Amino acid sequence: MTEANWVSVFARNEPEQHASDILVLPGWGEAEWQKLLAHTMPRPFRASEVVIQRGAAERTLYLVAAGLLEVGVTQVDGVSMTSLARISSGSILGEQSFFDGQPRSANVWAVADGTLLLLPYDNFTVFGEAEPALARDFLFAMARVLSIRLRNTSFRLRR
């Protein structure tokens, strides 16, 4: 998948997909996405591969350009896993560690082959200094994703 294809994955996200946890940035076209994605690095993955290990100390945001991933936590028995969410192209992973600098809180493995775009915190800082309005837009889009995920978790806990 080329950089032009990656841009189209994210630029196609529409505001009416409001219930989904994908990144939605109204007003962002290909030019805005190219400015952000210039600060990322592609990382292909294969089905069943662990792409994020719980406890890993890194501060990178993952943009899902293609594929399907599952987020889960290990149970007290240390063997069984509980699935928390499935994440598809157009969304993000690793946002908690990206924001707070703490170790990864869950495991993430690939359900299907795909590509992640890695955005290290330092690269985002450079982007933010060069494009503060775009960085603000992106942070609000990330906050929307976090809000949807928290709302979904609250709903599951009430059941």
Task: Indicate where each model-derived feature is located.
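Cytosolic regulatory regions built on CNB/CRP/Popeye-like sensor folds
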Residues: 1-159
